[in-house]
Each structure stands twice: as structure tokens, then as C-alpha cells.
């Protein structure tokens, strides 16, 4: 059984093979923006948010396909990046004798930005 991202990519490849696809990348980007806007417009309607978030994720997977990026691999990499950066935040907060809580969000954000900067320097 395929994970949801892989299933979405498979469905989109099958549709594209039958000609149901955006001919230009601009159309894919426009669809992503459209779905994001619809999610924003869903407001407090839980059912609408659920549906529109699914549509946005589906559109993002289609964008990944057009960009020739495997969405599951990209998500795995994003998860790993988040884990590295959040571990940095935790260490920085501990070194500063600060707790991880909403009241210290500015300090956590600063540590996050530092983690990003250090990753860029190493790249």
C-alpha cells in the first residue's frame, strides 16, 4: 500500500499519461495559489478546511511532480531538517537556562534563525 503522497503522485502521473495535465509550470503554480487561497477562505469551517487542505496538498504533490522532485523524499528531508534545527533550539534554550514555552518564543525563533544560518554556512 502506498503512502498518501506517493498515491497522489501516482494518480497524477496516470492522469498526465492520459493528457490531463498542466502544459506549463505556471498553471501548476496558479493551482497551488488557488488552493491556498481557498484554504484561507475556509475560515473556521472544519469540514471546508479539511477538504481544502487536502486539495492544497494534492496540488503541492503535482507541483513536485512537475519539478521532478519525489514528494515523499522531500518530506523526509524536511522532517530531518526540522529535527536538526529544533534540537539546536532545545540546546540553545537549555544553555541560556530558558524553558521551551510560548513566553520564550522570540528566543526560540532567534535560535531557529541561528540554526538556519549555521546550516547555510556549512553548505
Residue ranges and their predicted role:
Residues 1-53, 57-123:
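Flexible "arm" and connector segments at domain edges
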